[in-house]
Amino acid sequence: MFSQRYDPLAEENNGSRPADSGFGVSLKKRKLSDDESSDEEEEEEETDESEHESSQDEDINEEEPEEEDEDTNKVDDNMEIDSQPEVDPDYIHKHQAIFNKFKQSTESETIEQDKEEDGEEDANIEQHSLVPLPQPALPRDRKLSSVSTHTKNLDWLTKPQYASPSDKKAFTDFKSSSFMIKNLEKMGFTEAFSVQISVLNMMLPEIEAQKLKPDRVGDILVNASTGSGKTLAYSIPIIESLYRRVVPRVRVIILVPTKPLINQVKSTLLQLSSGTNLQIAALKNDVSINDEKDSLTKSVPDIIVSTPGRLVEHLLNDSINLSSLQYLIIDEADRLLNQSFQNWSNVLLDKIDSQINIAEVWKLSVQKLVFSATLTTDAGKLSSLKFYNPRLIIVNDSKQLVNEIFTVPVTLSEFKIHLGVAKNSLKPLILTKFLISTNKLSNVLIFTKSNESSIRLTELLTSLFQKLSINLKIAFINSTNNRTSIRSKILKQFSNQEVNILITTDLIARGIDVASITDVINYDLPNSSREYVHRVGRTARANQVGYAYSFCFGKGENSWFKKLAHEVSRSKEVENVDLNVKELISDRDEEIYQQALHELQQQAKK
């Protein structure tokens, strides 16, 4: 029933070679070592036992020959036959994560192969480079560009007329009255400067034409550097227009920012109107509002010079009748427009409109004349003046404007003195030695940042010059001694060189009109480009030569000065002055400086 099992050991002992093992596998006989023989015997015994158990499970009633399944048994070259292990569920569960990774790896390889196949197909497709589609210009971008441009100039208001600062013309070449030519010659003026030429050429023909027909003419805005002769530019035409008047009425109002300018403008008008019966009044805070009202009522002036605040007080008290007003002149307009002054522009213009009599057909409309060295481009500020057909005159070599129109005189030379911040403690001494070394010992105007610093610097410089055996007279003007009498006295002494060096602040800068000033020194830098222009504009007036020096200590002040200078239009670049402090100041100078400081401290304690 059972076939006899083949025993390799038996065959080996018998020395015979089996033809067939009965499993359909040809076995090769090889010589084994003792250890290999023992291992081989154990494996054969295990194989016999497993085959014996499997054979018992077969049906003994079957008569057919048994066929063994050879799939699970394999014989290697070493006569080893291994059975396939059974699948263990615990084993699969334990290594499930590894199986999952293997599965994902297999899937990803399949996807990559698919992509490569797709790529081969796409390679045959013609490819084109990506180019942006053409887009229409956005209206918003155009608007923003326009707004940015308008904030840098006044083209949005009117087309500017440029005039060269070097232009000159004899006053006799204008159609002026004989008395005007004589008065100008008495004042020492024979030639008109650029700003005066531009304004006179524009206004004198219109004044002559208005004698026959009262057509309304456009307003005028003038941007010219400080000291260019703006006061004469508007004073001459208004006197030419009024000197034939019969009945005195308020026909001209001139607004200025400070009381010193009131005196300056009134003095110019009185000299130009000499020989006429024109009445000129100045409204100041020196007297009460009621006293001024009585004076205006008893003697009605033709021309009023005032600050905006004082004028508004009189308008609210009905002290002034504006029904005959012909000219509204705003001098130093940038400062007046930057400060509200009781909302003066709205009050004044509303008062003018309310007193217009539309029944008077043969009547001249009010013409506005605006003058400034730093004319603003702010539409909000300029719109409050309600211009009619405005015309803009810019006296400047360059036609490239900045946000604010700042210009300095053409004849002005500017210099920058840059020193390290460590030298700041010797600042008064450096200034003193600089003035001595450059022989700038008269007609010098020095600007400081405050009243206290101006007084302190005056005391220090006076002491230092005395100790250095140099006899100079040094004075100061600030808001602490700005009474009309004191101010006029000091300015007269300064003009006559009885005072050699004058120290002041920004508050007083615009009221100083001394033609003899040759040098301006910015001991402390100004707070804005506008103030810088008005500071340095105290010299180089009326086409005379002038010099401006600015002290910069440290990188911070140097950067600030560069910003100020960048916003100013000029015909010449700012020059740098190399100042060697070690050569300029000796040990003896420092000892004198320390003594002067000690004396000043002792005076302050008293």
Curated annotation (Swiss-Prot):
Keyword rRNA processing present in the record's keywords: the answer is: yes
Annotated spans, Disordered: 1-88, 101-124
The Acidic residues compositionally biased stretches are 35-71, 78-88, 109-124
Enumerate the Gene Ontology biological process terms. Answer: maturation of 5.8S rRNA from tricistronic rRNA transcript (SSU-rRNA, 5.8S rRNA, LSU-rRNA); maturation of LSU-rRNA from tricistronic rRNA transcript (SSU-rRNA, 5.8S rRNA, LSU-rRNA)
Q: Where found, per UniProt?
A: Nucleus, Nucleolus
CC per GO annotation: nucleolus; nucleus; preribosome, large subunit precursor
Per the UniProt entry, the Enzyme Commission number(s) are 3.6.4.13
A Pfam family hit: DEAD
User: What positions does the domain Helicase ATP-binding occupy?
Assistant: 211-393
Which SMART domains does this chain map to? DEXDc, HELICc
- Residue window of motif DEAD box: 331-334
| Annotated residues for binding of ATP | A224, S225, T226, G227, S228, G229, K230, T231
The UniProt catalytic activity note for this protein reads: ATP + H2O = ADP + phosphate + H(+)
GO MF annotation: an example: ATP binding
What's the family?
A: Belongs to the DEAD box helicase family. DDX51/DBP6 subfamily.
The function of this protein is: ATP-binding RNA helicase involved in the biogenesis of 60S ribosomal subunits and is required for the normal formation of 25S and 5.8S rRNAs.
The domain section of the record reads:
The Q motif is unique to and characteristic of the DEAD box family of RNA helicases and controls ATP binding and hydrolysis.
Q: What is the name of this protein? A: ATP-dependent RNA helicase DBP6
What organism does this protein naturally occur in? Candida albicans (strain SC5314 / ATCC MYA-2876) (Yeast)
Classification of source organism:
Eukaryota, Fungi, Dikarya, Ascomycota, Saccharomycotina
Name the gene behind this protein: DBP6
